């Protein structure tokens, strides 16, 4: 996809050069000219940009990596095959009712990089889909919850193991095992619990 007007405006504000998708077969030339590649959520694992980045030794980042780089306010995360949006909404509502100013972000209507623009927010409740987790350099949120696991999104991930590995990344950046919220009744989630 070509960047829209909003993406172009963001790029100008951040001093980022946007580059259009190259002709098929020329990904290596393009990726070899950049320091980092930032992937939009949902780009399939089979996309040629990943092979080109590996070959060139170029880091592949997710929009959450940029948000973490630019903002250090607390982030709470929820992942799972089902129920993410409901739990994110409930957690955000509970935090708001306790006096915190939070923004639901991530796989919601608001990307985390947009949510961090709000200077009034105390924290962010991130709906962490496998699309966001799978290509993040290092996902960081605490606490982080994994609700459940079932086969899904095999049109985006290389296989079921890649989908599972993406979900498990929700706990990579927690400070302590006590920051992991795990549904131990789900055998896949339990197998990854810290």
Q: Where are the regions that the model predicts?
A:
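Short, intrinsically disordered, charge-balanced linker/junction segments flanking boundaries
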Residues: 1, 18, 191-194
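NAD(P)-binding Rossmann-fold cofactor-contacting core
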Residues: 1-10
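Charged, low-complexity, helix-prone segments enriched in Lys/Glu/Asp/Gln
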Residues: 9-10, 19, 71
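Generic structural signal for hydrophobic
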Residues: 10-11, 53
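Glycine-centered loop/turn motif at secondary-structure junctions
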Residues: 12-18, 57, 99
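Glycine-rich, highly charged phosphate/nucleotide-binding loops
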Residues: 14-30
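Phosphate-binding loop of NTP-binding sites
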Residues: 27-32, 41-184, 188-194
């Amino acid at each position: 996809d070509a960047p829209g007007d909003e993406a172009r405006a963001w790029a100008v504000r951040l001093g980022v050069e946007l580059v259009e998708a190259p002709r098929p077969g020329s990904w290596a030339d393009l990726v070899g000219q950049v320091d980092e590649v930032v992937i939009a959520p949902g780009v399939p694992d089979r996309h040629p940009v990943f092979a080109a980045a590996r070959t060139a030794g170029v880091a592949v980042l997710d929009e959450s990596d940029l948000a973490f780089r630019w903002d250090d306010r607390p982030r709470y995360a929820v992942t799972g095959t089902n129920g993410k949006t409901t739990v994110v909404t409930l957690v955000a509502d509970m935090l708001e009712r306790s006096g915190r100013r939070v923004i639901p972000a991530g796989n919601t209507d608001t990307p985390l990089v947009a949510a961090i623009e709000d200077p009034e927010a105390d924290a962010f409740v991130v709906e962490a889909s496998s699309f966001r987790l799978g290509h993040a350099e290092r996902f960081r949120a605490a606490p982080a919850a994994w609700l459940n696991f079932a086969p899904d999104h095999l049109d985006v991930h290389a296989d079921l193991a890649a989908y599972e590995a993406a979900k498990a990344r929700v706990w990579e950046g927690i400070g302590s095992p006590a920051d992991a919220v795990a549904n131990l009744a789900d055998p896949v989630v339990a197998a990854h619990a810290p």
